[in-house]
A protein has these predicted regions:
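Conserved catalytic cores of phosphodiester-cleaving nucleases, focusing on short active-site segments
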Residues: 80-103
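Catalytic cores of nucleic-acid endonucleases
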Residues: 95-150
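Residues at beta-strand starts and edge strands
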Residues: 78, 89, 180-183
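Interdomain/boundary linker segments immediately adjacent to catalytic/signaling cores
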Residues: 1-49, 53
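N-terminal cationic-hydrophobic initiation segments that often serve targeting/anchoring roles
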Residues: 55, 118-122, 156
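Glycine-rich, aromatic-bearing surface loops/beta-hairpins
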Residues: 127-192
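A short acidic/basic microdomain associated with nuclease active sites
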Residues: 54-75, 80-85
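Catalytic lumenal/periplasmic loop and adjoining terminal transmembrane helix
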Residues: 49-55, 97-101
Length: 192
């Protein structure tokens, strides 16, 4: 199960990136096997996949680079988690990740916090967004197709500028040693 919705025209240039993001997860799966998923390793791993997807979409991406941060007390040195650029547009991204239970997908506060952090990245005139990766889990057994569809429906209720999700069939039974099943990943983007 895979899809994307872009609600903000300024982020339309990310459509091929979000499509190739799932392809990058599939490539990882081909090499690492069904017992390992890149998206449960945290924000840095997911940022790397999104950067790889940008390059595959013939855009440019740069992770973890030094730059100016804007705060009330003025400008200071900081870092940006990711930038994605086309010939016409550049997006500066602050990234975070959450691992909620499948039935508890209210990520509104986490998305607002991530977008607030993104406001400090780059200059006020530059396009900025918070990117929240969501790796939902379920205890004891894998998620049914109906539960995954409910999850996607819940994701679409968020006031995000762009939403992408990928719940690959190969990972439907992926779980850790605690019996937590991680069926896939979603990405919420909110312009700062």
């Amino acid at each position: 199960m895979r899809g994307q919705i872009i609600n903000n025209p300024r982020l339309e240039f990310l459509a091929p990136v979000l499509e190739r993001w799932g392809d990058c997860i599939d490539r990882f799966n081909r090499f690492a096997g069904d017992a390992e998923a890149p998206y449960w390793h945290g924000a840095a791993a997911n940022t790397g996949l999104l950067a790889a997807a940008a390059w595959q979409a013939e855009l440019a991406a740069l992770q973890q680079f030094a730059g100016k941060k804007q705060r009330d007390e003025g400008e200071h040195e900081g870092r940006c988690d990711l930038s994605i650029s086309s010939a016409d547009e550049a997006l500066y991204v602050s990234v975070s990740q959450r691992w909620p239970k499948i039935a508890r997908l209210d990520m509104a506060e986490a998305l607002q916090q991530t977008a607030a952090l993104a406001r400090q990245v780059a200059y006020p005139s530059q396009l900025k967004a918070g990117a929240l990766f969501i790796s939902p889990w379920k205890a004891g057994q894998h998620a049914s197709p109906e539960e995954l569809q409910d999850l996607v429906d819940d994701l679409q209720k968020h006031t995000a500028c762009a939403i992408a999700w990928y719940f690959p069939y190969a990972y439907r039974k992926l779980h850790n040693e605690l019996g937590q099943y991680f069926p896939g990943v979603a990405l919420l983007l909110k312009q700062a």
